[in-house]
Design a protein with these regions (language model features):
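Short glycine-rich anion-binding loops that position phosphate/pyrophosphate groups of nucleotides
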Residues: 47-49, 108-111
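ATP/NTP phosphate-donor binding region
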Residues: 1-102
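Short glycine/serine/threonine-rich phosphate/pyrophosphate-binding segments
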Residues: 110-117, 138, 255-256
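Phosphate-handling active-site elements
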Residues: 94-100, 122-130, 260
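Active-site segments that bind and position negatively charged phosphate/pyrophosphate groups
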Residues: 202, 207-260
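Glycine-rich beta-strand-to-loop/alpha-helix junction loops that act as flexible
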Residues: 75-76, 106-108, 249-250
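A glycine/threonine-rich phosphate-anchoring loop and its flanking beta-alpha core
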Residues: 10, 19, 117-210
C-alpha cells in the first residue's frame, strides 16, 4: 500500500495541512467528523467534475452522515468571472450560511480560485476546504492562498489572499483526468523543478515513462515534492513581495497566449 503523506504550511498568518494520498476523505473520517459536526456544508464544483467524480466524493464521505448543498458552475475559464462569483455569494446568502460553516472547493484551478475568493468575501471569511481534482490544482493553485477571478481579458485581476483550513490532494480523482489536463499539471511540476531543484528535474526527466503512465507511487512522489518546494516559498513570502514571484515563471507569456 502506498504511504500517505502530509505537508504543513506554517506562515506568519496561518497554519494548515496538505494531505496527499488516495481515498483521503474516507481515511480522514474522524478528523472531518470533528470539524464538520453541526455545520452546514456547501460543495461547489463544475459539471464535468460532478459527472466524473462526485459519486466517488459522496462515497468517501458517506460515513459522515452529512447532507451537503451542491452548486455547479460550467466548466472552463469562462466561469471565472464576477457574475459567477456573485451567483455563488447569493446562493450562500440564500442558504443562510455563516462564517462557522464550511465551503468545499471540489474541482480544478478554476473552481478553486473562484470558490476561494467567494469564501474570503462571504461574511469576511468562511471556512474553506480545498479538494483539488487536477494535477495542476494539486501541485499549485490549491495551496498558497491566492484567490481570483478574471476581469474581462485581465486574468486573475480581482482577488485576495485567503488560505483553506485543509487541502486534500487525493490521487483517486486523477483517474479520469484528460491527457491534456494531466500534461498541463506536469508542466507546472517541471517548472517548479527548473526553478528550485535540479535533482528533482533530473528525476522527472529520467522517469517520464512512469509519470506518463500515471504510476501511483510516482504521482504521489511528484505531488509531494512539488508541494514541499512550493510550501517553503509560501511560508517565506506569503503575499508575493519577493521570492514567491519566481513561481510565476512562464505566466506572462502563458496568460497572454491563453487570452489571445
Amino acid at each position: 500500500m502506498i504511504r500517505k503523506k502530509s505537508i504543513s504550511i506554517r506562515s506568519k498568518k496561518t497554519t494548515y495541512d496538505i494531505l496527499i494520498g488516495r481515498n483521503l476523505l474516507k481515511e480522514k473520517h474522524t478528523y472531518l467528523q470533528l470539524i464538520l459536526a453541526d455545520k452546514k456544508i456547501a460543495i461547489i464544483s463544475d459539471e464535468t467534475v460532478h459527472n466524473l467524480q462526485y459519486a466517488n466524493f459522496l462515497d468517501q464521505i458517506s460515513d459522515l452522515k452529512v447532507d451537503p448543498h451542491l452548486f455547479l458552475i460550467e466548466p472552463g475559464e469562462t466561469s471565472k468571472n464576477w457574475n459567477v462569483l456573485k451567483k455563488v455569494l447569493d446562493w450562500l446568502t440564500e442558504l443562510n450560511f455563516d462564517r462557522t460553516d464550511y465551503v468545499i472547493a471540489f474541482g480544478g484551478g478554476v473552481v478553486g480560485d473562484l470558490v476561494s475568493l467567494a469564501a474570503s468575501l462571504f461574511r469576511r471569511g468562511i471556512n474553506l476546504i480545498q479538494v483539488p481534482t487536477t494535477l495542476l490544482s494539486q501541485v499549485d493553485s490549491s495551496v498558497g492562498g491566492k484567490t481570483a477571478v478574471n476581469n474581462g481579458p485581465a486574468k486573475n485581476s480581482i482577488g485576495t489572499f485567503y488560505h483553506p483550513k485543509v487541502v486534500f490532494c487525493d490521487t483517486s480523482f486523477l483517474r479520469t483526468l484528460p491527457e491534456r489536463a494531466f500534461l498541463a499539471g506536469y508542466a507546472e511540476v517541471l517548472k517548479m523543478a527548473l526553478v528550485f531543484d535540479k535533482d528533482f528535474y533530473k528525476f522527472l526527466i529520467e522517469n517520464q515513462k512512469l509519470i506518463s503512465s500515471r504510476d501511483e507511487a510516482i504521482l504521489l512522489h511528484i505531488i509531494d515534492k512539488s508541494l514541499e518546494l512550493k510550501s517553503k516559498v509560501v511560508e517565506s513570502d506569503e503575499t508575493e513581495q519577493g521570492d514567491r514571484a519566481l513561481l510565476n515563471f512562464g505566466h506572462t507569456f502563458g496568460h497572454a497566449l491563453e487570452t489571445y
